[in-house]
Amino acid sequence: IIETPIFYENCTAKEILGIHAQYMGKNITELDIIRALRMVGLKNTTKKVKDFSLGMRQRLGLARAFLTKPKLLILDEPINGLDPIGIQEIRNLLLSLSKEHGITILISSHILSEISQIADKIGFIKNGEIVEQVSMKEIRRENIDLEEYFMSHFLN
């Protein structure tokens, strides 16, 4: 999912997911669409997407991705532009997708304090290459947070 998901602005959330299901060539029912919308906590699904907040758009993007029951979700800056409540809601949703639905989630983000609350494993990329992978357990054993770890290992 890209940082700012793109949708047909004059469609409702249900219509967006229906179009996506047809495009993907999947046998997805109206019930599947309703489940996906419920799972991401998207309410007021009769509203046009043009009237959605950024948080609602992020949720719709996640519902669209989840509709095909992926094993892997790749997210680019999923909390950018969200208020603290929206950030917490997306964080809880991502944790739920991972734990309850067994989905692996790969997140690209510059907000290390937030990532440290979601991730099990961190990969650091420099010049397009993964230069280090470390678990959050290992970082916590050093009694530092993810930002301190990054600063001490990559800003010499």
Feature annotation, model-predicted:
Residues 18, 22, 28-44:
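Conserved ABC ATPase "signature" region
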Residues 48-55:
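Conserved ABC ATPase signature
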Residues 62:
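Hydrophobic anchor residue at the start of the ABC signature
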Residues 69:
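Conserved catalytic motifs of ABC-family nucleotide-binding domains
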Residues 73-77:
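Catalytic Walker B motif of ABC-type/P-loop ATPase nucleotide-binding domains
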Residues 88-100:
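Helical segment within the ABC ATPase nucleotide-binding domain
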